[in-house]
């Protein structure tokens, strides 16, 4: 499956909610969804009632877009979630939350998951003292995530420290905003997910 390279704002309009893919822009009047809260296209304002399958598919697409994951990898996460103890849907969300790019975003070390993915890919972060440039890297309890010392003086990280790093993070993470260091102190649970996600629909879709 190819990577989507179109405007991020079209994805928010397609899913009928803000996915916060553009960082600061999502909180301003420039947000395309705020101005046109309906699907893109000629007949976008004519919302159709979705079938059961349609709702399941839309929910899957929404979660994939929130976390920036393509189908093959998303399916792999679901298969992992099914093999874990507990509820498959909640396990799936926990795995997605544990992605390094998401953790960087949750710590406030990037304005969006998209930016976090880019910064991780460019080797600006270390995990337990070692450079990790794989956005899909799954963190575990005890892992320490930090901005590389050589990157801290870069203009973008100075801006990040001033604008985002001091914002609250989920309770499963702790951070030293001044030094741009974070630590995983617990695994994320369903209560830590702040987006309106109906994960049971995804489980139903993949269980057919």
From Swiss-Prot:
Q: Which UniProt keywords apply?
A: Ribonucleoprotein, Ribosomal protein, RNA-binding, rRNA-binding
Q: Which GO terms describe its molecular function?
A: rRNA binding; structural constituent of ribosome
- What InterPro entries does the annotation carry? Ribosomal_uS4, Ribosomal_uS4_bac-type, Ribosomal_uS4_CS, Ribosomal_uS4_N, S4_RNA-bd, S4_RNA-bd_sf
Is the keyword Ribosomal protein in the record? yes
Its job: One of the primary rRNA binding proteins, it binds directly to 16S rRNA where it nucleates assembly of the body of the 30S subunit. With S5 and S12 plays an important role in translational accuracy.
Tell me the subunit arrangement.
Answer: Part of the 30S ribosomal subunit. Contacts protein S5. The interaction surface between S4 and S5 is involved in control of translational fidelity.
Regarding protein family, the annotation reads:
Belongs to the universal ribosomal protein uS4 family.
Q: What is this protein called in UniProt?
A: Small ribosomal subunit protein uS4
Organism listed in the record: Caldicellulosiruptor bescii (strain ATCC BAA-1888 / DSM 6725 / KCTC 15123 / Z-1320) (Anaerocellum thermophilum)
